[in-house]
């Protein structure tokens, strides 16, 4: 009885320790980047709006380029790779959540046609596994396995993200067909400027909320500033600026409403593009091969017949 109670106590102690350790890791340590795909997953059922706009652009305001490479056509039930390219200058540093400077992270959302999904680990070729590395692919939701998100991951290592994709088999999945399908992709580098609740992150420009004169600037101990602006009617408005953005105003300066108080710290941005892929019918390829073979055979017989005819003509002329 005593031994059983001792085992239970040890298990409880172990569980409590793991819980506290996880809490410390998740909450206590400063984050180098916000987990931006989570924001979209929590707020939107589908990341692509009816207009074609990918919702990541709601938080990542700057526009940057992104590219995708996919095969022109694939056979059913085969594994192929889609490569998403998110280029940027790796020397750039962004403002982190704690106000310090650090490297940029990248993230991507890949919107595949219905039926296409991330390939199981046992179906991925070894050569492709070496390109993937330690990437983790997450379905956008349990209902949308054809929509995949990756990130945030270090941009210095992953300016190209390889997705191992398994194509569907229309013979088994009646919801898919041999057809040309669009593939949509969104990719960003760096943190966002807006949170889902509409508030600004510290990776954004801060503007004056009113017209007036800056009568005092106070630096906060942990970074950031408090600006007191005196309005024309004598009221004092307090502007709070978090750690990270750099001030471009000074005490005694007059400002107008919506005038920038800080530089724009953002060096990243979001981009989206699309590609096309054909789910090819093997029977069509076999028919095409058979057609080419028949043409070659017909051409061969035609040449042989022509030579035979020429020999007959030559024999008649000699006779």
Swiss-Prot record:
Biological process terms in GO annotation: photosynthesis
TM ranges: 285-305
Cofactor, free-text remark: Binds 1 heme group covalently.
Chain sites annotated for binding heme: 36, 56, 59-60
Subcellular location: Plastid, Chloroplast thylakoid membrane
Keywords of this entry: Chloroplast, Electron transport, Heme, Iron, Membrane, Metal-binding, Photosynthesis, Plastid, Signal, Thylakoid, Transmembrane, Transmembrane helix, Transport
GO terms for cellular component: chloroplast thylakoid membrane
Gene3D superfamilies the UniProt entry points to: 2.40.50.100, Cytochrome f large domain, Single helix bin
Cofactor(s), by name: heme
GO MF: electron transfer activity; heme binding; iron ion binding
Residues in the signal sequence: 1-35
Membrane topology: Single-pass membrane protein
Pfam family name, one: Apocytochr_F_C
Membership in a protein family: Belongs to the cytochrome f family.
Function: Component of the cytochrome b6-f complex, which mediates electron transfer between photosystem II (PSII) and photosystem I (PSI), cyclic electron flow around PSI, and state transitions.
Subunit structure: The 4 large subunits of the cytochrome b6-f complex are cytochrome b6, subunit IV (17 kDa polypeptide, petD), cytochrome f and the Rieske protein, while the 4 small subunits are PetG, PetL, PetM and PetN. The complex functions as a dimer.
Descriptive protein name: Cytochrome f
Classification lineage: Eukaryota, Viridiplantae, Streptophyta, Chlorokybophyceae, Chlorokybales
Gene: petA
């Amino acid at each position: 009885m005593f031994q059983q109670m001792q085992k239970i106590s040890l298990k409880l102690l172990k569980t409590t320790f793991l819980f506290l350790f996880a809490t410390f890791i998740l909450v206590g340590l400063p984050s180098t980047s916000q987990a931006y795909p989570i924001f979209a997953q929590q707020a939107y059922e589908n990341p692509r709006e009816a207009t074609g706009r990918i919702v990541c652009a709601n938080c990542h305001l700057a526009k940057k380029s992104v590219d995708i490479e996919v095969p022109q056509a694939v056979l059913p039930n085969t594994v192929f790779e889609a490569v998403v390219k998110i280029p940027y200058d790796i020397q750039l540093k962004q403002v982190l959540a704690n106000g310090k400077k650090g490297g940029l992270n990248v993230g991507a959302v890949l919107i595949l046609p219905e039926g296409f999904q991330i390939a199981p680990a046992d179906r991925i070729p070894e050569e492709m596994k070496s390109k993937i590395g330690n990437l983790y692919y997450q379905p956008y939701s349990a209902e949308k396995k054809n929509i995949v998100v990756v990130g945030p991951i270090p941009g210095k290592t992953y300016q190209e993200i390889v997705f191992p994709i398994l194509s569907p088999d229309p013979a088994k999945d009646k919801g898919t067909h041999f057809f040309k399908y669009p593939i949509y992709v969104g990719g960003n580098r760096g943190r966002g400027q807006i949170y889902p609740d509409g508030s600004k992150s510290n990776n954004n420009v801060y503007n004056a909320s009113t017209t007036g004169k800056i009568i005092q600037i106070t630096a906060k101990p942990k970074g950031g500033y408090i600006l007191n602006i005196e309005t024309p009617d004598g009221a004092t408005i307090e502007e709070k600026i978090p750690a990270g953005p750099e001030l471009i105003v000074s005490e005694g300066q007059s400002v107008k409403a919506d005038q920038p108080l800080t530089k724009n710290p953002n060096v990243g941005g979001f981009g989206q593009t699309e590609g096309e892929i054909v789910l090819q019918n093997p029977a069509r390829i076999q028919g095409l091969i058979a057609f080419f073979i028949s043409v070659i055979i017909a051409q061969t017989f035609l040449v042989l017949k022509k030579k035979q005819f020429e020999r007959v003509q030559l024999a008649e002329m000699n006779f």
